[in-house]
Amino acid sequence: MKKINPNNTESWKMLQNHFYEIKSFHIKELFKKDKNRFKKFSLKFDNRILVDYSKNRITSFTIKLLLKLANEMDLNNSIKSMFSGKIINETENRAVLHTALRNRSNSSIIHNGCNIMFDINKVLEKMKHFSNLVINRKWLGYTGKYITDIVNIGIGGSDLGPKMVIKALNSYRNHLNIHFVSNVDGANIFNVLKKLNPESTLFIIVSKTFTTQETIVNANTAKKWMLNAVNKNEFLDQHFIAVTTNAQEAMNFGIRYKNIFLFWDWVGGRFSLWSSVGLSIVLAVGFKNFEQLLDGAYMMDQHYLHTKFDNNIPVLLALIGVWYNNFFKSETEAIFFYDWNMNYFSSFLQQMNMESNGKNICRSGEFVNWQTGPIIWGEPGTNGQHAFYQLLHQGTKLIPSDFIISIIPKHPFKDHHKYLLSHFFAQTQALAFGKFNQKCNVHINDKKTFDERLSSISFHKVCKGNQPSNSIVLDQLNPYNLGILIALYEHKVFTQGVIFNIFSFDQWGVELGKLLAKEIFLNMNTTGSKNYEYDSSTNGLINFYKIHSNNT
């Protein structure tokens, strides 16, 4: 990948000038000037998904300049480099090949001289066989009872992706109960274990290195809990599975090789749900539905790889995001999924985006002097409307938003869904167009007081609008469409990383926190108050802990 600073490109300078020209334009005026604006700025994917980006503060010339920026930043070759397995994660000397995990054409993908599709298919077949045993009640616990509860122990990408997908596909769930333990806070695992019977519980320990502190602490607690019931280590075989790249560490923990599901160092954690990390997904919804998830992602991969940028959905959404982030200085981006089962989606995208593009060093190894990844946040509709939409409608911040919904619900209450859709359509309209001539119902007898009161309240009811949004409408939320949607956002994040000239697939900030926590943990276990080699604040916090923990 080329190392090009975006603000040195001709298109960046042109975009800056263009921004000054149109920054005061109102979305409602853009619609008035162009009766075909929706048609011009919307795309359909596979006749299943509509992406409407017409309610943005853009013109055709804006898109033209953004596409010019993508070309100047060598985006096309960067995409090809990722898909072909070149070392684009340079700081860790790794390829980035999560797309290979859903390569449904099964065409050869060569990495380090080997066709990795052989290993991918082998693991998929193992996942299929194992999940069939568990789902069909043929995998039995130490007393001969069939498994009723699965506990996925992992954090970050080993937790958020599978948890999001399983909740999203709630209507496809089988009889198995799936639980997630991620936080090292003991309350997390305590609240899960107290509901379970060890005779019918299966633990899946998910860790890329099998050394992640939070995961291993929780795994050891689960192991002790199980041993209290079974008393014999050999009985653990029926109750512990590992998903990792480090088989040796998993075996050191006590998990036999036959119970280990491998993945590879070219799979980043936040992009790993397509691998054996998705074993809990397979157990929850069955292997056929997992294949549909892969199929959908593969279709979006092909769209991203082969479609010209002016019709390329991930590229266009990414570039529009850059437009707000780097020229309007918007800083945040909201995700509003109007589906209760998608309540983990914004958290999932938060990790995908902020861990990938929350960087201040460019690919040349210098500090950037432009904005990189935005702050991602969100809440399912309509709850958010009664929490923070007020700020969107009448606050002082520019907050671009993605609104997502499906047409056909997965529940029988059709009237509920019509109400939900009406809110969805209304909010994007209100945010874009606002309301300037408010009517006010005030019941006051005195005419003069009434007129004064009416004028005062009407002014407070003004909503200026001009808040941009994209609308993504699915025909229905099924595994195939969910695969499309997740892959769309993955490629959006990568595209923005290319434009920002950063490495999107490392996370050295996360690693720093891990190292410091290990060191501080050792100091917490020493006796007496001390002045450790930290700042006075950290020393004071540790010593306050010691004083009060000794009093309990």
Swiss-Prot record:
Extract one GO BP annotation from the record.
Answer: glycolytic process
Q: Which GO terms describe its cellular component?
A: cytosol
Annotated pathway: Carbohydrate biosynthesis; gluconeogenesis; Carbohydrate degradation; glycolysis; D-glyceraldehyde 3-phosphate and glycerone phosphate from D-glucose: step 2/4
What span is annotated as the signal peptide, if there is one? none
> What SUPFAM superfamilies has UniProt attached to this entry?
SIS domain
The record's top EC class is isomerase
Q: Which residues form the active site?
A: 355 (proton donor), 386, 514
**What EC number(s) does this enzyme carry?**
5.3.1.9
Single GO term (MF): carbohydrate derivative binding
**Could you tell me what reaction this enzyme catalyses?**
alpha-D-glucose 6-phosphate = beta-D-fructose 6-phosphate
**Alphabetized UniProt keyword annotations:** Cytoplasm, Gluconeogenesis, Glycolysis, Isomerase
Localization per Swiss-Prot or TrEMBL: Cytoplasm
Under Pfam families, the record lists:
PGI (PF00342)
Q: Which InterPro entries match?
A: G6P_Isomerase, G6P_Isomerase_C, Phosphoglucose_isomerase_CS, SIS_dom_sf, SIS_PGI_1, SIS_PGI_2
HAMAP family on file: G6P_isomerase (MF_00473)
Tell me the function of this protein: Catalyzes the reversible isomerization of glucose-6-phosphate to fructose-6-phosphate.
The family database entries (NCBIfam families) matched by this protein are listed as: PRK00179.1
Which family does the record assign?
Belongs to the GPI family.
From the Swiss-Prot or TrEMBL record, give the protein name: Glucose-6-phosphate isomerase
Q: Which organism is it from?
A: Buchnera aphidicola subsp. Baizongia pistaciae (strain Bp)
Gene name of the encoded protein:
pgi
